[in-house]
Amino acid sequence: VPQFSSSGTTLDGRIKPDVVAPGVMLCSARAQEASSTQGTSCSSATHDGASTPLYMALNGTSMATAVAAGGVAQIRQYLRESAGINEPRSDLIKALVINGAEDLGVPDIPNSREGWGQIDISNSISPKDASTPLNLFYDDSRELEPGHSFLYQFDLDSSSEMDLSLVWVDQESSLISNQT
């Protein structure tokens, strides 16, 4: 995670970010009319078979956000087309993103630099051993109120792994980003 990236935690103690995405030296579109040519060119970029100055390597949250949004769109599409969930809720998608995230190393996750790790769509929708399809259990029919609990029981094969996430949709925070 580059040093120019913001990190958590929030004023109310939540770990942020939830996950991170690649955002350094990504090949991005450059307007043909742009007067500035600052930035590293994408030497392998071609258009109609010829190299082109229409792409350049850029850094920042604008790059990482596009990677994360594309990944979330793929997860949503998977849930609709393969899992039969016509309108997947954001908290289910968030759980899959968190469960699939790859730890980037020290310090242990979760932490205020990478949250639960770097987004990895393959891990989010495919079991690590790829021998069985993703088996989802989610309960979006009830809300957990303070002081209450729900009990769920699962019968597991001792040779299988289970990833579990309790997620929620965060409440809105301050519009001033350094006061979240």
Predicted regions and their residues:
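Short secondary-structure boundary/capping segments
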Residues: 1-3, 33-36, 113
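Short glycine- and Lys/Arg-enriched binding-loop motifs that mark or flank ligand-binding interfaces
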Residues: 4, 19, 56, 66, ...
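Short capping/connector residues at structural and topological boundaries
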Residues: 6-9, 31, 63, 124
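Residues that flank catalytic or metal-binding motifs in active/ligand-binding sites
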Residues: 15, 22, 93, 150, ...
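Secreted peptidase-domain scaffold signal
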Residues: 88, 110-179
